[in-house]
């Protein structure tokens, strides 16, 4: 589908995701496309292409990026007044009529059967995705729970002590730039700690992965983790959960 569109598109803009197989997919598309292919870092306030180095401790990443982070964290997205013509060409796939095919529960299951989805993994019905739900979840946390984040975040039994927005960031339902900008405007100790987790510990990992050619290799783990792993390799494991 992407290859078909790349032959008629004026420009391809995609998410910068620095892990195989996505990196190779983008390279293949760029080689065959007849138009520019642009990757945009939608994960980090400090773009991976701007820093993109590996440092062995989060506090070193914090110090190395302090000036850039201060400049970018409260920077709003530029507003562009652009009118894009609607695509009316032939589609290289069979489109889904959401109102007719997804609204009906039987048709919905028929669509799922056609997808490459493991049916033995059951959905978590109480969790919903999408931009609207994610924005509402962030707003609730911002209004009611951010003020107590530094005190409650380490209590695993407290479901409201943290934002629970990792999935929203991962699947692109919610921009971490928006969250960072709005949390930064609060200016409290809890907001500062939340930003520390969001912008230091989280982005430190993204930049490390971007900098290495072997992101899945165990050598990316710290020495203490590898040592612990090796020391317990012979431990009995009657059940392997994988």
Regions found by a protein language model. Give the residues of each.
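Short, intrinsically disordered, charge-balanced linker/junction segments flanking boundaries
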Residues: 237-242
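Glycine/tryptophan-enriched, flexible segments
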Residues: 54-232
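Trp/Phe/Arg-rich N-terminal binding region typifying the photolyase-homology
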Residues: 1-84, 190
């Amino acid at each position: 589908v992407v290859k078909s569109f790349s032959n008629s598109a004026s420009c391809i803009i995609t998410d910068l995701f620095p892990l195989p197989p996505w990196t190779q997919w983008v390279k293949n598309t760029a080689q065959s496309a007849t138009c520019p292919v642009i990757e945009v870092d939608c994960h980090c306030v400090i773009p991976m292409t701007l820093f993109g180095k590996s440092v062995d401790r989060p506090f070193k990443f914090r110090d190395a990026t302090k000036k850039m982070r201060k400049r970018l964290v409260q920077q709003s997205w530029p507003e562009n007044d652009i009118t894009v013509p609607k695509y009316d060409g032939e589609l290289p796939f069979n489109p889904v009529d959401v109102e007719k095919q997804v609204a009906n529960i039987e048709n919905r299951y028929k669509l799922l059967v056609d997808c490459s989805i493991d049916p033995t993994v059951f959905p978590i019905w109480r969790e919903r995705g999408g931009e609207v739900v994610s924005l509402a979840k962030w707003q609730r946390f911002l209004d009611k729970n951010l003020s107590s984040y530094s005190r409650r975040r380490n209590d695993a039994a407290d479901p409201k002590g943290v934002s629970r927005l990792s999935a929203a960031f991962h699947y692109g339902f919610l921009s971490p730039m928006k969250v960072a900008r709005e949390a930064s405007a609060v200016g409290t100790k809890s907001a500062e700690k939340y930003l520390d987790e969001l912008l230091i510990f989280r982005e430190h990992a993204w930049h490390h992965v971007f900098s290495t050619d072997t992101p899945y290799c165990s050598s990316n783990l710290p020495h203490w983790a590898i040592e612990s792993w090796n020391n317990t390799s012979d431990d009995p494991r009657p059940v392997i959960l994988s």
